[in-house]
Amino acid sequence: MALNWSFRVIFVSAMWCALLKFATLEEREDDNDYGGGCPFVVLGNGTHAKPAGCSHLCNGAPETLDNIECYNVTEEVAKRMTPDIPYTCWLGWCSKGECKRDNRTEVCYRGSERE
């Protein structure tokens, strides 16, 4: 009789431990937070994508890019572009959050939302 009772205690203890183990394996919601930033609007040219401008507001705070090629187009204008229609865009270089335009242009387009 004592052996039967011991088996039950061990079995219940093992089940309780397993339940606690699986209960702690749940993924927390904040595990996939990669910094909380906001993505920049980008335009493509068939082979590369570049940001439209070099600064924007993210949750009320400014975010800027530096030392990267950009299109000298505001995010507002880029968002109004018709997807998959080619446009002529001025190229520039991000410097302290401003896309400094140079004397080059290239075809650019806004991708479709499904991409």
From Swiss-Prot:
<dbReference type="Pfam" id="PF19429">
    <property type="entry name" value="EVA_Class_A"/>
</dbReference>
<keyword id="KW-1015">Disulfide bond</keyword>
<keyword id="KW-0325">Glycoprotein</keyword>
<dbReference type="GO" id="GO:0019957">
    <property type="term" value="F:C-C chemokine binding"/>
</dbReference>
<feature type="disulfide bond">
    <location>
        <begin position="70"/>
        <end position="99"/>
    </location>
</feature>
<dbReference type="GO" id="GO:0005576">
    <property type="term" value="C:extracellular region"/>
</dbReference>
<feature type="signal peptide">
    <location>
        <begin position="1"/>
        <end position="25"/>
    </location>
</feature>
<protein>
    <recommendedName>
        <fullName>Evasin P1181</fullName>
    </recommendedName>
</protein>
<dbReference type="InterPro" id="IPR045797">
    <property type="entry name" value="EVA_Class_A"/>
</dbReference>
<keyword id="KW-0964">Secreted</keyword>
<feature type="glycosylation site" description="N-linked (GlcNAc...) asparagine">
    <location>
        <position position="103"/>
    </location>
</feature>
<feature type="disulfide bond">
    <location>
        <begin position="89"/>
        <end position="108"/>
    </location>
</feature>
<feature type="disulfide bond">
    <location>
        <begin position="38"/>
        <end position="58"/>
    </location>
</feature>
<keyword id="KW-0732">Signal</keyword>
<feature type="disulfide bond">
    <location>
        <begin position="54"/>
        <end position="94"/>
    </location>
</feature>
<comment type="function">
    <text>Salivary chemokine-binding protein which binds to host chemokines CCL3 and CCL4.</text>
</comment>
<feature type="glycosylation site" description="N-linked (GlcNAc...) asparagine">
    <location>
        <position position="72"/>
    </location>
</feature>
<feature type="glycosylation site" description="N-linked (GlcNAc...) asparagine">
    <location>
        <position position="45"/>
    </location>
</feature>
